[in-house]
């Protein structure tokens, strides 16, 4: 794949090691707790054939209610987890040991989130999606960091915008824990990207960062670019119960 970006790679920054240590501690506890108790029997129609993997061209219809919102989150977690797996499988030129460790931490968080939804939703969960990241040039540091920030920001906005539709307090608590991790991902990626000590806690992060929110109807078209199946979200709730 050709690289259409023609400029000199910047010198990678030295990322604050205390922040890296903090990042490593926030992911593990984020998905403990609630076990999707609001998922009704009527909702358990996402995967009637019990298949684990989808095929390109399939239409995957999300259900309504809490189960629909949780599967919507599962879509996003699949994208993020696979993205970081590919970042580490195809490290860009000049990736420092510190950056490698940060990406490993980010991957571990997202893989944990993906595994949580896969296990908790079980037969009511969507299949494993066929993902396409061909638009991202993984050998270019700037492309990788821009994509990482975009995925983290979309994830944060999606949880903030979709959480209000969850009717069970335990499900909402789990979503709240995960979105706090996503918001911290945004901050650490911004520090890597902009190479200064204010990017981690700039005004737009401290003041506005936790209040960025998007509806599923805004998020899924952005996510669809990376999914070879079609996600049908017509059943997702659009009003607060």
Report residues per predicted region:
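All-alpha RGS (Regulator of G-protein Signaling) helical domain and cognate RGS-like helical scaffolds
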Residues: 2-16, 26-28, 41-241
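Bacterial N-terminal signal peptides
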Residues: 29-34
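C-terminal motif of bacterial Sec signal peptides marking the signal peptidase cleavage site
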Residues: 37-38
């Amino acid at each position: 794949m050709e690289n259409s970006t023609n400029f000199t790679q910047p010198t990678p920054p030295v990322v604050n090691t205390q922040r890296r240590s903090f990042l490593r501690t926030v992911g593990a506890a984020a998905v403990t707790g609630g076990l999707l108790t609001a998922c009704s029997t009527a909702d358990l129609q996402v995967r009637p054939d019990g298949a684990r993997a989808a095929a390109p061209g399939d239409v995957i219809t999300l259900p309504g209610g809490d189960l629909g919102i949780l599967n919507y989150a599962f879509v996003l977690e699949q994208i993020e987890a696979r993205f970081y797996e590919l970042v580490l499988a195809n490290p860009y030129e000049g990736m420092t040991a510190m950056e490698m460790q940060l990406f490993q931490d980010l991957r571990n968080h997202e893989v944990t989130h993906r595994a949580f939804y896969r296990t908790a939703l079980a037969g009511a969960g969507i299949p494993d999606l066929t993902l396409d990241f061909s638009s991202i040039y993984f050998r270019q540091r700037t492309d990788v960091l821009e994509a990482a920030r975009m995925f983290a920001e979309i994830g944060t906005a999606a949880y903030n915008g979709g959480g209000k539709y969850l009717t069970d307090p335990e499900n909402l608590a789990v979503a709240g824990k995960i979105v706090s991790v996503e918001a911290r991902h945004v901050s650490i990626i911004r520090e890597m990207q902009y190479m200064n000590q204010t990017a981690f806690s700039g005004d737009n992060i401290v003041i506005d960062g936790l209040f960025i929110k998007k509806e599923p109807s805004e998020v899924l078209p952005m996510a669809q670019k990376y999914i070879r199946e079609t996600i049908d979200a017509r059943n997702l709730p659009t009003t607060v119960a």
